[in-house]
């Protein structure tokens, strides 16, 4: 198993050119803790079974994404549900490029200095969604700390263009934390709100330094609460990955904090290490434990809890938004 240790006395990596995507060891070399690579990835338990993403529908959606120069988080983040979702004719779109300004060592999305925004992306995204005849779409993004509003206006532009071509569609946004730009970002978002506002806490506060460098647990909670105060009729949603070293007690505490901040929906899923250079899996949470978390969440008052090993933030998001049980 790989380990995480504090760095001391190491030379800082050089500046990255615009448009160069760093992944794996190059990416995690730029965080405040050192990831010692795993010698061998842990064997997954029997309850984690993933469909191989091979079907005509998978190929069709990938070709459509390339045609319109779009990205799906399903591919970029190596989501284990890619085959199931693509085969069902759905996808979670990732806007603002495929290079993130953050360096989270659990995530497989590339890091670097992103290119300027593609002004045609809102239109191209709307056309692609109309071509696919989708009824529920999740839109997420890389972090864009280089933008004065964190990319909030680009999100709003995308929602507006999609609604023009697909009247009646439901849109969920999975947004970054808008670090240092919360007020302007939320003002923009409130003027063109999604149907579900999602921002993931990802893990428990104790693990933020090693798991989410550059992010702040309390800031993320405040983002969700302030949006809810501004647009009270729109459901808010957040999620955690389990298996990074948290305890069950810490998970329950975070769930309670979420409810204190008026978060309506919750997702809980198993962290799966993308490569030997990413954060190690500390435990595989049993399905019975996920079921227990779901029961506790419902008791706390969440409107919907999706809790299971392969649950991800946008996994069957349409069903969760409609109140169906996911897990």
Curated annotation (Swiss-Prot):
Q: Where is the Radical SAM core domain?
A: 86-303
Q: Please name the Pfam families in this protein's record.
A: LIAS_N, Radical_SAM
Listed SUPFAM superfamilies: Radical SAM enzymes
| SMART domains cross-referenced by the UniProt entry | Elp3 (SM00729)
> Catalytic activity, per the record?
[[Fe-S] cluster scaffold protein carrying a second [4Fe-4S](2+) cluster] + N(6)-octanoyl-L-lysyl-[protein] + 2 oxidized [2Fe-2S]-[ferredoxin] + 2 S-adenosyl-L-methionine + 4 H(+) = [[Fe-S] cluster scaffold protein] + N(6)-[(R)-dihydrolipoyl]-L-lysyl-[protein] + 4 Fe(3+) + 2 hydrogen sulfide + 2 5'-deoxyadenosine + 2 L-methionine + 2 reduced [2Fe-2S]-[ferredoxin]
- Classification via InterPro entries: Aldolase_TIM, Elp3/MiaA/NifB-like_rSAM, LIAS_N, Lipoyl_synth, rSAM
> Which organism does this record belong to?
Pseudomonas paraeruginosa (strain DSM 24068 / PA7)
Tell me the GO molecular function terms. 4 iron, 4 sulfur cluster binding; lipoate synthase activity; metal ion binding
Enumerate the cofactors the protein uses: [4Fe-4S] cluster
Alphabetized, the UniProt keywords read: 4Fe-4S, Cytoplasm, Iron, Iron-sulfur, Metal-binding, S-adenosyl-L-methionine, Transferase
Residue positions binding [4Fe-4S] cluster 1: 74, 79, 85, 314
Q: How is the cofactor bound?
A: Binds 2 [4Fe-4S] clusters per subunit. One cluster is coordinated with 3 cysteines and an exchangeable S-adenosyl-L-methionine.
Name the record gives this protein? Lipoyl synthase
């Amino acid at each position: 198993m790989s380990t995480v240790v504090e760095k001391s006395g190491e030379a800082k990596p050089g500046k990255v050119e615009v448009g160069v995507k760093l992944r794996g060891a190059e990416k995690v070399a730029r965080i405040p803790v050192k990831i010692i690579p795993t010698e061998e990835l842990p064997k997954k338990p029997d309850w984690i079974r993933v469909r191989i993403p091979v079907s005509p529908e998978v190929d069709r959606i990938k070709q459509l994404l390339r045609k319109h120069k779009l990205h799906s988080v399903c591919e970029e983040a190596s989501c284990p549900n890619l085959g199931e979702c693509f085969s069902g004719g759905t996808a979670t779109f990732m806007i603002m490029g495929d290079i993130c300004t953050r360096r989270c060592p659990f995530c497989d999305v590339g890091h670097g200095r992103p290119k300027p925004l593609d002004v045609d992306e809102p239109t191209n995204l709307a056309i692609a969604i109309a071509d696919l005849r989708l009824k529920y779409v999740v839109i997420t993004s890389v972090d864009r700390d280089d933008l004065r509003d964190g990319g909030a206006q680009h999100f709003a532009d995308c929602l507006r263009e999609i609604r023009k071509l697909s009247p009646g569609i439901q849109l969920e946004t999975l947004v970054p934390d808008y670090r240092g730009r919360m007020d302007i970002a939320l003002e923009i978002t409130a003027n063109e709100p999604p149907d579900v506002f999602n921002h993931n806490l990802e893990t428990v506060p104790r693990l933020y330094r090693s798991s989410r460098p550059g992010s702040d647990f309390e800031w993320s909670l405040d983002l969700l609460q302030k949006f809810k105060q501004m647009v009270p009729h729109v459901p808010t949603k957040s999620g955690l990955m389990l298996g990074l070293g948290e305890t069950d007690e810490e998970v329950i505490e975070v769930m309670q904090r979420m409810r204190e901040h008026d978060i309506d929906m919750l997702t809980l899923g198993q962290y799966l290490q993308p490569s030997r250079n990413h954060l190690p899996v500390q435990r595989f949470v049993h399905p019975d434990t996920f079921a227990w978390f779901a029961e506790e969440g419902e008791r706390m008052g969440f409107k919907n809890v999706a809790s299971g090993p392969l649950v991800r933030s946008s996994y069957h998001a349409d069903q969760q938004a409609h109140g169906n049980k996911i897990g």
